[in-house]
Structures are given as C-alpha cells and as structure tokens.
Amino acid sequence: MSFSVNSSQQISIFDATANLTQREIKMLEKSWAKYFAENIFPAIDEEPFKVLYSDRPSRHNTPVNVIIGALIIKEIFQLTDEEIVETLPFDIRYQYALHTTSFEEQPLNDRTLGRFRARCNTYEERTGIDLIHQCIVGLSSEMAKMMKINTGMRRMDSLMVASSIKKMSRLELLYTCVANLAKFMHKSEDGAFPKSLIHYTEEDDHNRVLYHNRSEDTESKITQVLKDAARIITACGSRYDESSEYQLLIRVIEEQTDKEPDGNLILKSGKSDMNSELLQNPADPDATFRAKAGKDYRGYIANVVETADKNNSIAVDYQFEKNIYSDSQFVKDYLDKQPVSEEETILVTDGGYCGYENVKQAAEKKVHLITTDLKGADVADIYADFKFSEDGKEIISCPAGHRPKSNVYDINTQKCKASFPIEQCKGCPHFAECNPQLHVRVATIKLAKRTSYHAEQQRFFKTEKFKEYAHFRNGVETIPAALRKRHNVDKMPVRGLIRCRLYFGFKVVAMNVRKLVKYMSRLGKCALTPEIA
C-alpha cells in the first residue's frame, strides 16, 4: 500500500449535502462538525505518516487525515471502532467533519483503524518515534493559536492511569504464567508437552486451583506450581524462546523465586528483592506498581502540560510512561525537548517537580520554573542572602556583604566552605542567624547553593505574586478529572505501554477539541450539539 496525500477534497454534484434543505444546512453549520471540518481537519499533517507505507507503486492508502479525524471524533463521543465505522455512512455530520460527503463510499471499514494503530505502534517500537504524539502536539498548538491563548504561561500535572488488569496473588500469577505456556504447547501439538500438566489446559482448572482453596493449602499449591514450572521449562528446550508465554514464565520465575542447592524453586522471602517493576499480570507485562498517597496503583502515569489564560486552556503537550516514572524526570524530559525561547516562559507545577537542578535546566531554556511546594525541611531564612558564583562553587559574599578570605568546594556534598575573619563575624548583626563554626582566627560556614535557593523560595512563598501563581496552577487539576470522568482514561480497551500511549494521546486531543468548540460557541460561531454538551 502506497502513501497518498489527501490535500484536496473536490465536491461532486452528488455531494451528500446537495439534497439538504436550507433548514438542515443551517443546523449542520451550527453543529460541531462545521468547525471540525474547517479548522481541525485541515490542520492534520499527513506527511510524517508517509514512513508507514510502501514506496513502491501500489494501491493508495486510506487518507491519513480521515483516519486521524475519525479517531479524534471517536474519543469525543466515546465510540468503539465498530460504532464510528457504522455511523459514518449514515450521519452527515461525521462525513462533513471528515470531508467525505462526496465520496461514493465511505473510506473506513472494520479493520482500517486497527491496522493504522498497529502501523504506528510497530513504527514506534522499531524507531522510538511517536508519530501520533507529534501530530497531536501540532494540532494542540494550532488550537491554542485559534483560541488566542498566551502560551507564555504554562502549568503541569501528572495523573495515574490504571491498566485494565486484576490484582493477582503470587499463586495466581505463577499459575497463570504456567497455564498460558501449557496451553500454547498443547495447541502447538508439541510431543514434548508433559502429560502430567494437561490439567492446566482444562477450562475449570483455574477455579479449582485458585478459588476452591483453603488458606492453609496455598503454600503447598505454590510448591506444586513451581515444580510444574520447572518441568515445563525443561520440556520447552530452546524451541519457545521467542514466544511471549515462555518469556513471561521465565521472567516471573526470575523475579519471584530463588533456587535451592538441590535445584528446587522456592518463593523469595521478604521484600528485599521485590520492586515496582515486577510483573503484575501477564496480560500487561509493561504495567508497574506504585503506592502513592496511601493507594496502590498498577499501570501507567501520564504528564500533561497546559497553556492557559484567564478564560481558556489547552493541553499542549503530554508524556505517557510506566507509573514508576517520577514527576522530576517528567519535567527534565519536557525541558530537554524545548528550544531556547526568545521570551521567558513561566511553568508552574506542584512540589513533586521541584529541585534546584530542574530550576537550573529550565533557566537554560529561558523557562522560569515555579513550584508550589518544596521537598525537605525548612532551612534558615538568612541563607537566602548568601551570594554564590554562577556555577555554585564559591560564596561571593555573606548577608552583611563581606567577601570570604577563602573558599573550598566539596564536590561530593556540593557545599562551599567559606572562611571569614573571626572578629568580623562576631561583630556582625547576623552572627546568631548564620551560626558559623568558630576557630582560632576564622569563622567558617558550609553552605550549598541549592540550600540558598531553598531559602529564597521559602521567602517567595510568602508573597502575593506566589499566591497568584499557586491559584493559576490549581486550574490544571481539572485535566485528570476530565480525562477520568469524560474520557474513561482508566478503562482503555488495550494493554501495553505503547498501545495505551496512543489511546491516551487521542483522549487528550479530544478533550482539546471539546474546549475549542465551547470557545467558538461562546463567540457565536458554533453551537455545541446535545451529544457533546
């Protein structure tokens, strides 16, 4: 299948809108479809998706902008693939939005969307390039311009995204991995399949082993499952090394068990070797575990960057990772991608993104990073008045304006040890606050630039300007709520990091389109229909 750009859509004399009455045309032009057709659809850049198709002359692809537009509409209305495909031929609003009113036959079938997603996922697995992310960020930037939002003010927040998997006990996890491999070998009619494990292929065996189970039987059943695991791994040899069932069983055995001197497998005891990256459920090998705010989460974490003004906001960037990813790493990744801007951009976040290194990195990109909280204990206020060199390796002056006699920088602690004449320090009004260490001739103080920055931020938190920034940041809390309640982000019908990332991206842009339509309706140019009100 070769790539072809769907850059122009010529209207035919048999166009679906030709038979509409004036009243029907007026209703169509007041609907969401008109604005989608005139602004969103033309902004979809098809060219980056050329790499998904063959260079050889062959049948042309289904228009990429039609596919992406359909996937966005699908998320706006929370439709399944089947519903969007079956609705398109009969709902003129969908055709109008996707510029297909003149098509003799609508270009989507029951496999179009799934195959396109598979192409994008495979390309990302091979190259690490997320074409959908690039497309959505570009669309969101255009929407921000349409809404005339000041992009110099941004805010950031993260949200946990649940994987659609159940919590498994260690017995169930081990049993499921053994059963999956047993069923795979049995289906392959492998003569080496141990006959003693045939019960794993029976439909009721799962319930018999796991649910018809007394608590005192659990240990003996785990022992038996581990023996069965060792037996089936031996029977596999090297023939199943590439199968996911075999790889997952090997993974769970390595993560959950130790080998005794006699070769038998036993469960690991204690939590010393347990970590968040352990397999949670073989149905989603990418899902990880994280405890946050007293709750346990299994799945992923997303980070969203929103630009906003007094009345409007648009999510202009996002990132989707395993849920062991930290907020601090999210802001580092975001700053790495940003070009050095001509004018300063303000980025307001919560305390999870704080850190002196993050502030320094942001400053290099002309981004003023403001966090609404700080990690660690409060420090002495006087530390804010110490002046450091640009690289933070030398104290230039103390709060009284005196230069130190000498400076020694400790690379391990990143602290400067500054020495001042002892009489000078004793006669200083800040002597008690600084609390230097006294020697025979000098008084010394050890201080890191990050500690001085911490003290500066403590002062800043008491200002009216900070209260304005904190109020601005609070607005980003609506994004997790909207994605959960309206776009069902915790109930995505796919598993795996890359697949979930693609779905999440379309939920973000669908949220943005809804905001754009509401913005236009306030201007009197477009009206929301009841379906998306």
Predicted features along the sequence, with ranges:
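Basic, low-complexity segments
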Residues: M1-R56
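Double-stranded DNA-binding cores of transcription factors and transposases
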Residues: F3, V64-N65
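Short amphipathic helix-turn modules centered on a small-residue break
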Residues: P48-S54, Y96-F103
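Short basic-aromatic helix/loop recognition motifs at nucleic-acid
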Residues: P57-N61
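Alpha-helical support elements that line or immediately flank enzyme active sites
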Residues: I68-Q78
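Anion-binding and metal-coordination hotspots
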Residues: T80-E83, L88, S102, Q106, ...
